[in-house]
Curated annotation (Swiss-Prot):
GO molecular function, one term: ATP binding
Top class in the EC scheme: ligase
Matches recorded under InterPro entries: SAICAR_synt/ADE2_N (IPR028923), SAICAR_synth (IPR001636), SAICAR_synthetase_CS (IPR018236)
Source organism, top-level taxon: Bacteria
Biological or metabolic pathway of the protein: Purine metabolism; IMP biosynthesis via de novo pathway; 5-amino-1-(5-phospho-D-ribosyl)imidazole-4-carboxamide from 5-amino-1-(5-phospho-D-ribosyl)imidazole-4-carboxylate: step 1/2
Catalytic reaction annotation: 5-amino-1-(5-phospho-D-ribosyl)imidazole-4-carboxylate + L-aspartate + ATP = (2S)-2-[5-amino-1-(5-phospho-beta-D-ribosyl)imidazole-4-carboxamido]succinate + ADP + phosphate + 2 H(+)
This protein's encoding gene: purC2
Keywords: ATP-binding, Ligase, Nucleotide-binding, Purine biosynthesis
HAMAP family (alphabetical): SAICAR_synth
Protein's UniProt keywords contain Nucleotidyltransferase: no
Protein name: Putative phosphoribosylaminoimidazole-succinocarboxamide synthase B
CDD domains in the cross-refs: SAICAR_synt_Sc
Similarity field: Belongs to the SAICAR synthetase family.
EC annotation from Swiss-Prot or TrEMBL: 6.3.2.6
Amino acid sequence: MTTMLSSDLPLPKIGRGKVRDIYAVDDDRLLLLTTDRISAFDVVMGETIPMKGAVLTQISAFWFGELEGVVPHHMISADTDEIIAAVPALKPHRAEILGRAMLSRRTTVFPIECVIRGYLSGSAWKEYATSGTLAGEKLKAGLVESEKLEPAIFSPATKAETGHDENITIARMREVVGDETAYTLESMTRAIYTLGEELAREQGIIIADTKFEFGRDKDGRIILIDEVMTPDSSRFWAVDAYKPGQPQASFDKQPLRDYLDVERRAGRWNGDAPPPPLPASVVEATSKRYLEAYRRVTGKELKI
């Protein structure tokens, strides 16, 4: 399977995100094509990560299947043959879309990242260690790095296609989407995370934190969209290696984050685009983490 930095399919391309290319199928459907692009600290790298697009698409498809009947979602199919049957123009491009395409329902997307944190890690730990707060809200004193947060903390952010997302308060979120919608988004976020965290733990994975996106479909329903509990949207830890009070090894893009942190501390990168080039060792280590995440979450090896 070749890597993909960008795509060119015989459908109108209506969007390009940090990782996904979005194509219009018709008035009701979209094709989401997950490339092997990778971003960290909201900056897209110049290199691709082998198998990454397929991992993200197929983990999301797994979770959408598990969530069937729990929350409504946008996925129609992530099976390549089913997609080609529904969109025959894609038949000559089977090799390009294999494993990485998802046929989805169109929605009007809410401009909010619904972040939920079950453990104190990453940027949340850095904020707490500095000011004793998370998303601007005071937390109890004495928490340690990677400590479990009970209950999990909902901390929304604005959604940026490029550049840096910005954490916002729940009060600000209510101003953006309205009180009723804000309540629904938080409730759905908590329900999805609770179910996902329980199922992942059975597979030996802790989902330390994750983020979701939602949209409103043509019938007015709020539905789950985009990706679900993947290595790009989540922090995965091994249950059997979890030790609060220290950083945890992650089954996600942590090798990339660690490398970029070194480059920033050394003054070789200022945190904005363009990013530094990635060594082959970082690319390989990151690809292995993605494939391991798929195996851990689904209990299967990825076969495309």
